[in-house]
């Protein structure tokens, strides 16, 4: 009964929910749970490098399974809370841009909330010192399992020759990680729209990808 479920049904498309790291056990059809949530990145790394790699591998495995079933195009999406924070952190490090210029209001933060968000990202980056030349290190230290899984899907697209469509900001950050790991992945990544998050335009420009709509879903 979710909006995405209804849209998929109307368009005769299938949806595959995946549990990458929910804090509780779920009944989703595909369980790739790597941890019961990530850690507080303002106090230490969000996850271990091993967990980040497992997340990437889970995404690649999903593409392999769907490729074996005959799917010829895939799209990514996520349901997360607070994941524009991790995405802005990852984008800021990988693009070597100031946190203030890469961070937006997400689902509708107040001005005070935005300041707290920016400060939290700055603290996490200063504490963990992610290496901008090592996308997996950045993912592990200030990213999330949702981002890892989707980055793996984009990598899987390159491995199996299947185009993968980016959704919003979090999905774009995942695609950026995939491209930093494997530049050839770019040839299999398609943009659907550009998010209103400040970093979105810079990410698409960096990837050399063109979007066709400005969705602005929260307005």
Task: Identify what each model region corresponds to.
Residues 86-143, 149:
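Phosphate/pyrophosphate-binding betaalpha-module
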Residues 195-205:
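Non-transmembrane, aqueous-exposed alpha-helical and coiled segments at domain scale
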């Amino acid at each position: 009964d979710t909006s995405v479920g209804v849209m998929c049904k109307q368009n005769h498309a299938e949806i595959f929910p995946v549990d990458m790291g929910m804090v509780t056990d779920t009944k989703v059809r595909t369980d790739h749970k790597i941890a019961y949530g990530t850690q507080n990145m303002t106090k230490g790394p969000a996850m271990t490098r091993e967990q980040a790699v497992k997340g990437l591998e889970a995404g690649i495995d999903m593409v392999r399974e769907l490729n074996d079933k005959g799917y010829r195009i895939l799209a990514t999406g996520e349901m997360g809370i607070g994941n524009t924070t991790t995405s802005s952190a990852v984008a800021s490090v990988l693009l070597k841009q100031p946190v203030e210029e890469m961070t937006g209001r997400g689902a509708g933060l107040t001005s005070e909330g935005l300041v707290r968000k920016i400060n939290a990202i700055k603290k996490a980056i200063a504490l963990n010192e992610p290496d901008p030349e090592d996308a997996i290190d950045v993912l592990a230290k200030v990213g999330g399992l949702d981002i890892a899984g989707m980055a793996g899907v984009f990598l899987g697209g390159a491995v199996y020759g299947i185009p993968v469509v980016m959704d919003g900001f979090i999905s774009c950050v995942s695609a950026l990680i995939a491209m930093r790991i494997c530049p050839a992945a770019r040839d299999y990544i398609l943009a659907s729209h550009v998010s209103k998050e400040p970093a979105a335009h810079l990410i698409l420009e960096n990837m050399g990808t063109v979007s066709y709509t400005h969705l602005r879903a929260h307005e």
